[in-house]
A protein has these predicted regions:
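Transmembrane alpha-helices of multi-pass inner-membrane enzymes
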Residues: 17-31, 39-57, 241, 423-474
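Interfacial loop-to-transmembrane-helix boundary motif in multi-pass membrane proteins
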Residues: 64-82, 132-148, 158-171, 179-206
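Alpha-helical transmembrane segments of multi-pass inner-membrane proteins
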Residues: 2, 12-28, 116-124, 144-155, ...
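Hydrophobic transmembrane alpha-helices and their immediate junctions
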Residues: 11-13, 182, 296-297, 388-429, ...
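N-terminal signal-anchor transmembrane segment
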Residues: 3-125, 152-156, 431
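Long extracytoplasmic/lumenal interhelical loops at the membrane interface
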Residues: 316-339, 343-347, 351-386, 407-410
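A membrane-periplasm/extracellular boundary helix in multi-pass inner-membrane enzymes
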Residues: 27-39, 206-215, 264, 268-269, ...
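Structural signal for the C-terminal ends of transmembrane alpha-helices
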Residues: 52-66, 121-133, 179-188, 243-250, ...
Length: 474
């Protein structure tokens, strides 16, 4: 097993970080942006304090347990990974497309960017030279290439500041995944990765639902849970699969509660792609285990719960309205959006319009519906923003995940390895289906896209362990 070593004196490394932090703080105080002394600033400070407190607690527990260096780095990296997953929910806001295009961002947006910088600082404290050498080895190179492409293309988008900020988050997420790739050595490490993702999606699913129920203007908006119903259905469906996977591994009965909560939120949100993907992915989770009775039980439970929700909430009015307006034929206007954006794609087919240029489709593309926000398809999202280069890299990531998981599923019958491969496959199908109708991948470094990129690392590790076990049995 490879170990990570320190190539420079610790005092020099830490001193450089302190000097950099001091310089950035001085520049920030000199600029005196209006949000500096607002409530958002205190939120950033508070969240940063929580992050470093968690890192301290995890580090202290590792010393007491006598863990090896690789596991220590992995646990610390997963804390930062979790913090990055939930950052959008901590700094929740809704900025109209026109305001973003004009460069008018909310204080919460600046706060979230500052929080990413805090997470990056935490990562810098863990960086070791040998870990960075793996950035362009194996499957990691596809992650690194996509992140670098987005970073390079960001200045060419209609709003470079917006695109650069999100490219920075994507770059940070890839750095964390490279560190995870360098430190994941067994099935327990992969399970730890999914525990980190689980607690992230708990926040991403439960907090928006609670926010909707305390919303003074009403719990429902046009028949669906108030907020971002498409995103919420996706996150809740992902939570269900993660809870089922971890419960299968560890038999934690309380995880069943999160399955129920996740399924309820998934249906109440009314995101049609999210509901279909959630039902299909859980069904696949049981089918791959040949648990046909569980398949029928799951489908029956969804049918009963869905019926209760339709009777007890205004959700039925949303589906009735959807049918009356004949939106099924255009997938809620998506096909019309794709047709309208296609000429723009052909203008720059190789390099695209710049990372996250699709955020402003309604401002640039004639025929795009208002507040489109993205291409509503992950592959078209990459094609519009980063051209064929970005699309090829994204397709390569998908193909490698499928190839790795297929090999892991066909490998030796180690129970936990099989469950992790089955769970990873179900999560992938959930994200894949959603991404056909939303920008689940290929665009912003949101939690679902981060999880998809993480599946590339996990699937490669599962395949490597499968190949190793297969070699030992011959």
């Amino acid at each position: 097993m490879k170990t990570l070593t320190i190539a420079t004196p610790a005092y020099l490394h830490n001193g450089l970080l302190v000097a950099t932090l001091a310089a950035l703080s001085f520049l920030l105080l000199a600029a005196r942006p209006p949000w500096l002394f607002s409530g958002v600033t205190f939120t950033v400070i508070g969240c940063g304090g929580v992050l470093f407190a968690l890192l301290f607690v995890v580090s202290a527990s590792q010393r007491s347990q006598g863990l090896d260096l690789a596991k220590s780095y992995l646990r610390l990296a997963l804390v930062v990974w979790w913090a990055l997953l939930i950052s959008e929910e901590v700094f929740y806001r809704h900025t109209p497309e026109a305001e973003s295009f004009a460069g008018h961002f909310s204080e919460a947006a600046y706060g979230e960017a500052a929080y990413w910088a805090v997470a990056f600082l935490a990562l810098l404290l863990m960086i070791r030279p040998q870990y960075l050498r793996q950035a362009f080895s194996g499957s990691n190179k596809w992650l690194a290439l996509f992140a670098l492409l987005c970073l390079i293309s960001a200045p060419f988008s209609p709003t470079p500041l917006y695109s650069l900020a999100w490219a920075f988050k994507l770059f940070l997420a890839v750095l964390l995944l490279v560190l995870c790739s360098a430190t994941i050595n067994d099935l327990d490490d992969i399970e730890s990765f999914f525990w980190s993702a689980f607690w992230g999606f708990v926040i991403l699913s439960v907090v928006p639902a609670v926010r909707a129920f305390v919303n003074p203007s009403g719990v429902f908006d046009k028949g669906r849970l108030w907020g971002s119903p498409n995103d919420l259905s996706l996150c809740a469906g992902t939570l269900v699969v993660l809870a089922l996977l971890l419960n299968s591994l560890r038999k934690r009965t309380w995880l069943v509660g999160f399955v129920i909560v996740g399924t309820t939120v998934m249906i109440m949100s009314g995101g049609k792609a999210g509901i279909i993907a959630g039902i299909a992915s859980v069904t696949l989770f049981y089918v791959l285990q040949k648990r046909l009775a569980a398949v029928f039980g799951w489908l029956l439970a969804v049918l009963v719960l869905g019926g209760i929700i339709l009777l007890a909430t205004p959700l039925a009015t949303h589906f009735i309205s959807y049918q009356e307006r004949d939106q099924l034929s255009t997938f809620t206007g998506r096909t019309e959006l794709w047709k309208a954006a296609w000429p723009d794609i052909l203008q720059r087919p190789i390099v695209g319009h710049g990372y996250l240029a699709s955020r402003f489709l309604s401002e640039h593309v004639e025929g795009a519906f208002g507040e489109a926000g993205h291409m509503h398809n992950g592959f078209l999202e990459a094609l519009y923003n980063n051209g064929l280069i970005g699309l090829i890299i994204l397709v390569a990531i998908h193909l490698l995940i499928v190839k790795n998981l297929w090999r892991a599923l066909k490998g030796p019958r180690d129970r936990n390895a099989q469950l992790l491969a089955v769970g990873s496959s179900a999560i992938y199908v959930n994200l894949l289906i959603n991404g056909l109708f939303n920008a689940t991948y290929g665009g912003r470094a949101s939690a679902p896209f981060m999880l998809l990129l993480g599946l590339l690392v996990v699937s490669e590790k599962l395949r490597g362990m499968t190949d190793q076990s297969d070699g030992l049995t011959r």
